[in-house]
Every structure is written in structure tokens, then in C-alpha cells.
């Protein structure tokens, strides 16, 4: 697996190389995608209460992990390649801490009273955030089964850590606000509130800081995404030019993502194509259309979720199938 410079010509050279069909008959759409820190493995969760583990570097399926008793969503690696946490979709809505090699649970994180819609691991330590339909966002430590901090929230939030692990963002789609919090001063509330002045911007499904710490992406499934200055909160760009996805009952982990250098955004399209936006060379406060598209796998495939490998020149899309794209000269 190679690593190449990220630019428009190279992004257009990414090609689809592998497609994985569901392993079970009662298959359902993939609801989350996550790479480990080293970019060697990919973990997905599906609406049929299973998780799938892949070798990202070899584009190879490795294993299915069943969670039929509890259901699963938002499966993410900890900082150990053989461990993950994921949210339950039934029973008691505990967050599970699982060893992927032994299939043994290491800990249950109890407290949420409704579905957990989002989980994010702190990039520099073993704490993580969860957002739930029980009107709370919670901060946890992998070593302790009870939450460290509970933040009241009237609606399920999108959540994201900045690269330093010192700041996190909570996105509230009901009041069109994003709050930025200092982890050391959570109880003081957000130190910056970003207002989104677009009442049509709905169906949020992603918050993501760029790896260079400069930008904050707010993704949606309506064919539009927004980029903000991560320091000032100023809206910089509106990304358009893709078709909206129809509403569905299942969650997903976001239809847009930054490239690892933070200079481009890739987004999925209901047409099946992958859109490329270049915001780094653009004048701020502009509406941007895609500079190009990576061809779709087939006209029958409409991937909702997308994730770029943090270390290697490859990305993955998913919905009914999991599709690997790699750089190809």
C-alpha cells in the first residue's frame, strides 16, 4: 500500500479495487466505518447486528463479529488495534468495550437510557465521547465504567475531537449550533458557539476536524456540506453539487470526509460517484462545486458513508456493500 501526495490529479487516479458483499442472508446496510490509528485495519458495523473486520492494507475481509443480543452501531477502534468500543442498539444501550482477538468484553459503560448515535475516541488518550437520544453527551475513560462528565443536550448531537485532543465540538441540528468545548473546562460550557444561518441545512450526519486543525466540516445527507474556520467559527465554504440521499431508519457515519492533509473533501453522491472539492485553493465565503468525480462502482451502488485512511492512499465507501478505493498510476 502506497502513500502519495494529495492533489486533484492524484485523487482522480483513485480506482475501485474491491467490493465486499454482506456475509449473512439477513444483511442490512453498513452504519459506520472506522480505521485504526495506523491505517492497517477497517472496522464496520451493520444494521443486522454484526461488525466486520478488514485488512485495509491488503483490502481483505478478516472476520465477522456478531452482537445479536445487543445490536451494534458506531464501532470504533481504541488506540489498540485489537480493541474496539461500540454502542448497543437494543436492551440497555450500554457501550461495549471488546477485544477483537478473543471476542471477550473488557468493560461495559453504563448510563445512557436511549440509543447512542455517535462515539468518538480522543486522538491522544484513552477517553472518549458519546452522544445519545437520552438528551445527554457523556465523557468516559476506558478504565472506568461510569461517565466522567455528563453534558445535557436536548437532541442527539454530532461530535468530534480536534487533533490536539484538547477541544471537542458538539453539533446541534435542531438549533443550528455547534459548540466548541475545552476539555479542561467542560462545566463552563462552550467557549465558542458557531451559528449556521441556513434553515434548509438538515439531516446532519458528520462533524470532523481536519488533521491540520484549521477546518471543521459539517456533513449532511442532503447533498450539501459546510466548512468552518475551526478557530474563529466563520463559515468558509458551502460544498454543493451532489444529489441528496433519501431518508431511512438506519444511522450512518457521514457522507463526507477530509483527506488526511485537510486540503480536500471527498463526498458520496446518490448517483454513486465520489465528489472532490478543493477548498484550500479557494476564496473563503464561497459556494464550491466539485472539481471532479471518481467514477462509481456500478449504477446500482449508492454508498452513503465514506472514510479516508489516515496513513495510506486509500479510502472506503459503504452502504449495502463495502468498497475499497486505492491510488492507481
Swiss-Prot record:
WD repeat start-end pairs: 25-64, 111-150, 152-191, 199-238, 246-287, 298-328
GO CC annotation, single: chromosome, telomeric region
Organism expressing this protein natively: Saccharomyces cerevisiae (strain ATCC 204508 / S288c)
Molecular function, one GO term: chromatin binding
Protein's recorded name: COMPASS component SWD2
Functional note: The COMPASS (Set1C) complex specifically mono-, di- and trimethylates histone H3 to form H3K4me1/2/3, which subsequently plays a role in telomere length maintenance and transcription elongation regulation.
Assembly information from the UniProt record: Component of the Set1C/COMPASS complex which consists of SET1(2), BRE2(2), SPP1(2), SDC1(1), SHG1(1), SWD1(1), SWD2(1), and SWD3(1). Component of the cleavage and polyadenylation factor (CPF) complex, which is composed of PTI1, SYC1, SSU72, GLC7, MPE1, REF2, PFS2, PTA1, YSH1/BRR5, SWD2, CFT2/YDH1, YTH1, CFT1/YHH1, FIP1 and PAP1. Component of the APT complex, which is a subcomplex of CPF, and is composed of PTI1, SYC1, SSU72, GLC7, REF2, PTA1 and SWD2.
Localization terms from the record: Nucleus; Chromosome, Telomere
Pfam families: WD40
Stored Gene3D superfamilies: YVTN repeat-like/Quinoprotein amine dehydrogenase (2.130.10.10)
Keywords: Chromosome, mRNA processing, Nucleus, Repeat, Telomere, WD repeat
Family of the protein in this entry: Belongs to the WD repeat SWD2 family.
One biological process term in Gene Ontology: termination of RNA polymerase II transcription, poly(A)-coupled
InterPro entries: Swd2/WDR82, WD40/YVTN_repeat-like_dom_sf, WD40_repeat_dom_sf, WD40_rpt
Note: Present with 704 molecules/cell in log phase SD medium.
Domain of life from the UniProt record: Eukaryota
